[in-house]
Amino acid sequence: MKFDASRLKDPSFFAENRVHAHADHIAYANLEELSIGETSLCHSLNGLWKFHHALNAAQVIPGFEAADYDSRGWADIRVPAHIQMEGYGAPQYANVQYPWDGYQDVAIGEIPTAYNPVACYIKTFFVPEQMADRRVFVSFQGAESCIAVWLNGHYVGFAGDSFTPSEFELTDYLIEGENKLACRVERWSAGSWLEDQDFMRMSGLFRDVYLYAIPKAHIADLHLKTLLDDSYTDAVLDLSVQMALDPSVGACSVSFELTDGGRLVASAACKAEASLHVQLPVKAPKLWSSESPYLYDLLLTVRDADGRVLEAVPQRVGFRRFEMKDGMMHLNGKRIVFKGVNRHDFCTDSGRVVPVETLRRDLLTMKRNNINAVRTCHYPNSSALYALCDELGLYVIDETNMETHGTWETIERGKRDIDYALPGNRMEWAPMMLDRVNSMFQRDKNHACILIWSCGNESFGGDVIYEMSRLFHRLDDTRLVHYEGIFHDRRHNDTSDMESQMYTPVVGIRKYLAEHRERPFIMCEYTHAMGNSCGAMSDYTEYAYEEPLYQGGFVWDYIDQSIRTKDRYGNETFAYGGDFGDRPCDYNFCGNGIVYGDGEESPKMQAVKYNYQNIIAEIADTKAVIANRAMFTNTGAFDCVAILARNGEIIASAPLETDVPPMESREYALPFARQTRGGEYTVTLSFRLKADTPWAQRGYEVAFAQGVYAVQEAPKHERYAPLRVVRGDFNTGVHGEHFSVLFGDLKGGLTSYRWGGREMLKSIPRPNFWRAPVDNDCGSNMPQRYAQWKIASMYAATNATPELARLNAHPVATENADGSVSIRYIYGLCTQPDGHAVLTYTVHPCGQVDVTLDYNPVEGLGDMPEFGMLLKMDADYDQIRYYGYGPNENYVDRREGARLGIFKTTAKENVSRYLVPQECGNRTGVRWAEVTDHRGRGLRFASGAMEFSALPYTPHELENAMHDYELPPIHYTVIRANLQQMGVGGDDSWGARTHDEHLIDVKKPLSFTFSFKGI
């Protein structure tokens, strides 16, 4: 048999001599190996391989796979790795469009020929001594997009699924001494039409490669089921085993032992046969869930007639029952709510080559932020993910390697008819797709974490996908099947067991469920977290507890798919689509993570953690109603600490014993009386881990709630020297003890504020109506719709018209009865129709300056992004201390997770690391903020409850940069004090607008007052 490269465009050519898919358990040669976790039956081939890069199939070196071909002149390459990350070609980011679109006219199933890189690998090895006289196989855990394999010049086989193992038997071709393993990996093959996922397009051997040997009596496959009775009390562990038995081995036995922390729970033994079926009754097992991921240990031991161990196979077992009950999804008898996230298998330094420690970091971050579910968008992940999800407690939607968005998008746009869909009704593609279903199922079937199988993503509908769903059901009666595409194509509506949609607003979900009550509803993608986003997420999360049929969703998505690199000056930066010269591309649309590319949490995570927490409370002065949204865990499992603060300063704390059963609520008296001393009080309930867990240490906060009340304070009366007003020809000065304020007639505004002899202002404060557009703004054309407000922010002036110039030529300083002095300016906003704003400064003898901005609505002028003031201070004033909502940035539609308190930050730290610079760093409900230098000198800003930000850049500088390295050098600190900024939105990033309730109402007069004073 020979490899026929011409078949790469044949959808029926997806496996040749490939080993049948099987479970991902690990086998050990004896119990001693098992005890130390090192198996002699496996030998890694990771490391350096010889490598040749061809731009297309025609440039592949003929005969490179021959045993006598000399590859010493080839380069070395690391395995596992994407070749594009090793300097061969470049990553290409594309969302919907196929990566070859526009370069070559390629029909469905065909592949590009002019540019379709081929990676040729050679690895020499000696068969490890412990594998001698055994059957030997090679496993490629991930080869993108397909792989052909040779050993010592003999063609071994072919496989064409990038994301499930490609395994081949090598036994017949092994020789004594050095063996030569050669393989050829095409960047694109027929299967690539099914791999149009929204990710960085790369290729190569990107997961582990290893040899494994099997003993003469071998557990080739294992399928376990945990069958709970209808009371969810007792269980049967149902085991189906397939064995590979060499005729020479003689009589063998297999023992089954289920243990719990070393204690034997159940056992059985039987004669080894090709197929075995064993059931182990288990009384009252501890059940597995995200809240309590309890795992038992199953050990299968194969022994020969003399009792000698031939093989030992361990398997973790989580007892759980997932089912459709009363029209809803239930786990262990309880209605489940998915608090999930979509996760691409991605590492900023190596692409889809994800080290286990990076994977663990991701999952620990999820657990710490109350995420309970993962959707493996949109392909099977490495086996390590499922083992860790079993251990840590994360529910999984395991998704088949299928996305053909680039084909059905043309149907949606009306360019093609329905028959163009892939796989659609093209039954010639069915064998490949059913094979992908089977490969994923067989590998992953024993993981307790997997509750739902998914047929794939964004591939429209049709007969083929329906058959995929049917195959899942035939293979597994313990899980449900998911497919979102039925929303677009209802021909096979029962392809999915649940209604699944993407980015439908809550009002749309309500409407759908009002008319369709036959099955539950989930959002497999929602809250598109591109850039500064996740606004109004709570609308979705709260709805899950209002509508039983709505059972949660999965945020899009977990991590920015950005690649760590250097700018031209050697500074670290994170690159996105188009930065590699890749075209076509979709630029920064890969930056949708609630964590940055390096795994650091973005400010959005603050809201995600809060919206997903299982304990909520409503606090009123001296009592709290605590609601427990957990399925199985009493609130008594956590320490609850009540914290009392006055004006942001903690004055008392005390434990509060709670005992709220799952899905119930109870009222508790707080350990503090209502305070009588004047001030603003916060009562915070903090729920914390009582003991260390695998994902966080004792004392870690898993949930909090906060109540606020105020007690009237008596006004303070302090005496200061009277103000001295100097009315010059071109300036008006207002002077007091230790400070001086100057208003300029020529420049039309506050030109100077000196405190203690130091000038505090870098420029004249200005009315501001603009923010740097966030990604959601750009997707909804906000810059175009609101452009007049950008112009107003840049060019509003007191001399915008001759009439205004006359009115503002000699502003009058009015001396008020309380000893203060006021001066007023009228700004023309340069809008069409004309708009005006009135800015009034009032200087008090203490040195405080009140700033009031007034705006009267103008018919024909639309919503404004922001209403407030902008001023600059020297960059030395970069230390921020404030009393408001924090600690991370927050907005009117993303304040969940922020708490009222006193926080510290810096202007530079306030710049969030979104891939494209945009609005960031805002804080809501700010009572006061101090902007100082390192010696504590600066300005204190105050208001009742303003929005506030302090950044090193203006909104326009942020807007003008497409990368962080395009931002200018830091010269000042930009203060923006606002009545309000519009919300950031987040329903999607390509058209959805900020919800009306989170916009600034410009149909009514707007007035905003804040003050500043030197410190």
Positions of PLM-derived features:
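Extended substrate-binding grooves/exosites of carbohydrate-active enzymes
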Residues: M1-G37, V96, W193, V309-D621, ...
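Accessory beta-strand-rich segments of carbohydrate-active enzymes
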Residues: M1-V19, A27, S35-I36, K50-A54, ...
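Accessory carbohydrate-binding/adhesion or oligomerization-edge regions at the termini
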Residues: M1-W100, R184, G261, T541, ...
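An acidic-aromatic loop/edge-strand motif
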Residues: M85, A90, N95-I111, G160-S162, ...
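Beta-strand/loop-rich accessory regions of lumenal/periplasmic or secreted enzymes
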Residues: M85, A94, G142, R187, ...
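Short glycine/proline/serine/threonine-rich loop/turn segments at secondary-structure transition edges
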Residues: M131-R134, L174-E178, V282-L295, T676-T682
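Catalytic cores of secreted or luminal carbohydrate-active enzymes
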Residues: E195-I219, G570-I619, R629-E649, P662, ...
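Intrinsically disordered, low-complexity Pro/Gly/Ser/Thr-rich segments with frequent PxxP/GP/PP motifs
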Residues: A268-A284, G648-G678, F687
